[in-house]
Amino acid sequence: MSSSITAPEGIINPPIDELLEATDSKYSLVIYAAKRARQINAYYSQLGEGLLEYVGPLVDTHVHEKPLSIALREINAGLLTSEAIEGPAQ
């Protein structure tokens, strides 16, 4: 019996090696993905209120998919860019 249910996307997919190509370090990747996941979570929270301050997911999502998994897939697809912010000159 075949099933049409696909394997869930998670922390192991996309692979970390591919994700690290988008950032300078693992630390940057974690911060980058966490900030985007917060934006996605806020977007879903605001849908019920009619406020659309944040941009929703840029990739197709599933009902039970977590915001962090969505953010990692967006980064892997090259839909987001990360820019370094320079500190104040001393």
UniProtKB/Swiss-Prot annotation:
Reactions mediated catalytically: RNA(n) + a ribonucleoside 5'-triphosphate = RNA(n+1) + diphosphate
The keyword Protein biosynthesis appears for this protein: no
GO biological process: DNA-templated transcription
Alphabetized UniProt keyword annotations: DNA-directed RNA polymerase, Nucleotidyltransferase, Transcription, Transferase
EC numbers on record: 2.7.7.6
GO cellular component terms, semicolon-separated: DNA-directed RNA polymerase complex
Membrane-spanning residues: none
Signal peptide: none
UniProt keyword Flavoprotein, yes or no: no
Top-level EC class as recorded in UniProt: transferase
GO molecular function (one): DNA binding
HAMAP family linked: RNApol_bact_RpoZ
Function: Promotes RNA polymerase assembly. Latches the N- and C-terminal regions of the beta' subunit thereby facilitating its interaction with the beta and alpha subunits. Required for kasugamycin production and aerial mycelium formation in S.kasugaensis and responsible for pleiotropy.
Assembly and oligomerization: The RNAP catalytic core consists of 2 alpha, 1 beta, 1 beta' and 1 omega subunit. When a sigma factor is associated with the core the holoenzyme is formed, which can initiate transcription.
UniProt similarity note: Belongs to the RNA polymerase subunit omega family.
The protein's name in its UniProt record: DNA-directed RNA polymerase subunit omega
Organismal lineage: Bacteria, Bacillati, Actinomycetota, Actinomycetes, Kitasatosporales
Name of the gene this protein is made from: rpoZ
